[in-house]
Amino acid sequence: MEKEHQIFGIRAIIEAIQAGATVDKVYIQKEASSELMKDLMKVMKRGNINFSYVPVEKLNRLTPNNHQGAVATISPISFFDLESLIESVQENGKKPLFLILDQISDARNFGAIIRTAECTGVNGIIVQKAGSAPVNGDTVKTSAGAVFNIPICKVEHIKDAIFLLQASGIKTVAATEKTDQNIYDISLNEPVAIIMGSEDRGVNPSVLKIVDEKAKLPMFGTIGSLNVSVACGAFLYEAVRQRS
């Protein structure tokens, strides 16, 4: 589990409470009265959440980020066991769709990816303990609270997770420029795990050696790559398209 941390932003706090996260306390800016703030107050009262009104200066001391007049302290997020999650997804008769993040270290990219993964019905996100972005306030806010609505698994080594997925009948597909195969030419309409690489290095070469397939997005401009969260969205929505 991560150490206790803060989340900021009204919508992210609402999502956390509604998803059943253990919110210890919410600090609300005095005299804040937007419609979204009123929604937060209703959600807190229904959930019997401890809160207090504070000057904006206190909120600014709690976080340098755009807090929108609300900061919450939240208990650590529980991570899922990968093997148990795979079994649960398969027992429920779902066609598994997993997302593996190979040492993506930027918290905002991580949050954006989590948000897209939740929107596209990903059954679980898998990250490596070492070298991966933490689940912190930036992650939670960028994900718009989606981090509380999708299972996240932490593993010692990405390769071990890939071997487990493959042994469970789940195809592994790595997003990489080091292939001639286009994402639109491979099947994602089956149990599959999509692997996205780090912002600077991409998918680790040792990982590329063991995956079932490699695929890339077509590029038509002079810049040869996309932000990882954007590329991830393109891959996931292609999976959605094929499964629809």
Regions found by a protein language model. Give the residues of each.
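Glycine- and other small-residue-rich loops at beta-strand/loop junctions that grip anionic moieties
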Residues: 5, 29, 102-103, 128, ...
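RNA substrate-binding interface of SAM-dependent RNA methyltransferases
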Residues: 15-21, 50, 87-181
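Short, acidic/turn-prone active-site loops that include or flank metal/cofactor-
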Residues: 31-32, 56-57, 130-132, 199-201, ...
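Surface-exposed amphipathic alpha-helices with a cationic face
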Residues: 45, 162-166, 240
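Active-site/ligand-binding-proximal alpha/beta "capping" segment
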Residues: 173-227
